[in-house]
Amino acid sequence: MSAMKITFLIAVAGHLLCGVCDCLLTYMPGGRFHFEDMKDNGRLSAVFKGMPLRNSLLSMLLGCLAMFLFAFGYLALAHWMRAFSETCAVLMLIGTVMVLTFGVAHHVFCGMPEWLYVKMGRTEEARQLITEFFTKTSVTLIVCYLGFLIFGVSLFVPVVSGWTPLPRWACVFNILPLMLVLMPTRVGGSGNWAGAIMFLGLLLLF
């Protein structure tokens, strides 16, 4: 098995693990968490009732490990692209760095408020605190997904244009269109399931 395929396998494992971590922050004993629940403490408290504190801690810690793992796949693709488009390769590298730096912060900033909310007894004061915290740190989410956008477009254009040895239809194995398909389903961890599908598809094509 080539080194490229090994990095793709590691990336698949990383995205699957990160998807599980997302689900730990999304699906609670009281039901599915929606951001709209943060507007009403009655709804929010009902969702988080009975949630073990270890869930958010595991999500934060394993999420950092997961992003470390899937970094190998993105960096390998950026390096591979250099043979066909130096510009796209640089953009893919920039997008990857944006995802890894701001994405790790965002993952921790999602887990920490949930841990604090439960630790503080799911009170109205706790709800106000975590809402303010999440709002003021939401830039990490924006930059992370901007990085995915830059990476996805920079991979999509060369493949669909025929600049690479991959068949043009291989452009579907790209995190951007896969995320656009999965996100309307509102399933927890949709971005990571999209990433796992992308690397699994590319694993079969390389």
Tell where the protein language model's regions lie, with residue ranges:
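Hydrophobic, aromatic-enriched alpha-helical segments typical of multi-pass transmembrane helices
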Residues: 1-206
